[in-house]
């Protein structure tokens, strides 16, 4: 068997930090899939032994695809799946054509892992429920469940792992991404530099707001609470951001920016109501 599938990045239309609970911050966000030039292509086939190939920037044990497979294997064991079903994961040859940059706020590693879990469930006809896939996805990484969901637009809550479809006109073909070369943002450093400015109470209002309205009425620092700490901790990012027009928005903890296609400088005229 040979299966090939494409994986697209996400952007955060808005990302609002609520409060810290345990080691991590609770948040609310709107994630949208972006089908533009950036995509990873993953091929999965049966082989004599396991292999995972791709231009990855981390050791195998830290790779999100490898992590997803270990979590999946343990899950199948806990559900008493047959020995042959579990063994089938040990003879997969997985190859990734990697184009989505990492440390860019685009969910690159999570996209690959989420896509793999979603597609393996179909390839092997395991009939795992979305909830079961989500329980594994949240162990891989906070953004993974958005990619498992296959939604084009969704609200993410809790630590980012609770996903709810958001019904709206999809923006997947209307957005373009700018991912600066050689500028990497450390999510950990940015969260450490984050300082809450006000007590955030507008959760429900944000989660109801259409993405297009957010982009047309707010500027990038109003939409993303991590922009300021990212600029504080990264000089290269600061240099790039200062040159960008108002139509550009910041995704995740960076370093990528995105905008509506065919928007000009100064396209955002009205002020965001927070």
From Swiss-Prot:
The record's function comment reads:
Catalyzes the phosphorylation of the position 2 hydroxy group of 4-diphosphocytidyl-2C-methyl-D-erythritol.
Binding-site positions, ATP: 101-111
The record's InterPro entries line, in alphabetical order, gives:
GHMP_kinase_C_sf (IPR036554), GHMP_kinase_N_dom (IPR006204), IspE (IPR004424), Ribosomal_Su5_D2-typ_SF (IPR020568), Ribsml_uS5_D2-typ_fold_subgr (IPR014721)
Q: Which organism is it from?
A: Helicobacter pylori (strain HPAG1)
Instruction: Name the keywords, alphabetized.
Output: ATP-binding, Isoprene biosynthesis, Kinase, Nucleotide-binding, Transferase
The pathway where this protein functions is:
Isoprenoid biosynthesis; isopentenyl diphosphate biosynthesis via DXP pathway; isopentenyl diphosphate from 1-deoxy-D-xylulose 5-phosphate: step 3/6
Taxonomy of origin reads: Bacteria, Pseudomonadati, Campylobacterota, Epsilonproteobacteria, Campylobacterales
Q: What is this protein called?
A: 4-diphosphocytidyl-2-C-methyl-D-erythritol kinase
Coiled-coil residues are: none
**Membrane spanning stretches:** none
């Amino acid at each position: 068997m040979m299966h090939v599938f494409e994986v697209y990045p996400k952007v955060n239309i808005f990302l609002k930090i609520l409060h810290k609970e345990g080691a991590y911050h609770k948040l609310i966000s709107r994630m949208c899939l972006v089908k533009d030039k950036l995509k990873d292509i993953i091929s999965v086939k049966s082989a004599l032994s396991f292999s995972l190939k791709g231009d990855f920037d981390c050791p195998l044990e830290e790779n999100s695809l490898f992590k997803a497979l270990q979590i999946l294997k343990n899950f199948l064991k806990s559900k008493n799946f047959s020995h042959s079903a579990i063994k089938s994961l040990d003879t997969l040859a997985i190859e990734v054509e990697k184009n989505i940059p990492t440390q860019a706020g685009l969910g690159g590693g999570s996209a690959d892992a989420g896509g793999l879990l979603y597609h393996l469930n179909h390839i092997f006809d395991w009939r795992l429920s979305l909830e079961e896939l989500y329980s594994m996805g949240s162990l891989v990484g906070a953004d993974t469940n958005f990619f498992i969901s296959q939604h084009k637009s969704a609200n993410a809550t809790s630590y980012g792992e609770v996903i709810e479809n958001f019904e709206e006109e999809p923006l997947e073909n209307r957005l373009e991404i700018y991912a600066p070369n050689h500028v990497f943002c450390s999510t950990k450093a940015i969260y450490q530099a984050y300082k809450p400015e006000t007590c955030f109470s507008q959760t429900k209002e944000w989660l109801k707001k259409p993405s297009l309205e957010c982009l047309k009425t707010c500027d990038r620092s109003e939409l993303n609470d991590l922009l300021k700490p990212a600029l504080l901790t990264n000089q290269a990012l600061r240099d790039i951001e200062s040159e960008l027009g108002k139509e550009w928005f910041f995704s995740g903890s960076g370093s990528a920016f995105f905008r509506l296609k065919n928007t000009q400088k100064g396209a955002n005229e009205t002020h965001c109501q927070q």
